């Protein structure tokens, strides 16, 4: 083949290849791929991620409280996303003894409408007497910005969140919850009494939030968590930094200083229960840094979405600092916040 004929042939192949690539059908999962902020039935915060990896679809979900968990199945067909979640139910006899464990599967279907998601959840009732069907919504979470250069971030004047005398500047997140919070000797203390085994039923103690709301900031505080106790510090009411008696345990995304169920500390830096510990937390551009007792355990890591118990799934909103009060006794002092100055 001479040079001119080869050039024409090569050009034709190139154009044909470009046209073929242009005309290739989009993946059916393309409209659903990414992360979604959900408002689940009851108005609570949820989160969904759908991704295609190695030729198959996968996903994970946060449903109100608890942890981000993998979905049991993900299927996309005819413009409809179908996912399933499985949870166990214990069947007990009259004496309260577990006699049977069953797995219940709920199905969630979704359609994309622009940057919105319209979803329907169908779940069996726990006693097996039929199904419950609920509709809810979501919206696409914008892409994460680059990790900020924290050396260039400017922080404003410090704001003392707790005056050491009373609960001025704070109120219960749930107005009808029992209040275990009090100012005692310059310390913000939560006396949440957990029922003893076989004793009284669980009492719902309230979470405590600041009256003021904030965007990005640096927050420093001291915390004292007794043995086997549990609390949390919610940043903007959306992201929980875990407070837990986890001394001596391997690192885990549910242990002291973790971003609950999302980011595992790089090293275990907690102290034994009953000792005062320091937390230095920076939240900028949806990236978080946590310094526990002088050791950086989360270093400017991206936050992919809300955590369990969030007030909202909308990460664009300013929000309060809120302290978890329903899981056990805990004490805080020297809570100081410095907002980012843009």
Feature-to-residue mapping (PLM):
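N-terminal secretory signal peptides that target proteins for export/translocation
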Residues: 1-6
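Boundary at the C-terminal end of the N-terminal hydrophobic targeting segment
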Residues: 21-29
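Carbohydrate-interacting regions of secretory-pathway proteins
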Residues: 28-342
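Bacterial N-terminal signal peptides
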Residues: 10-21
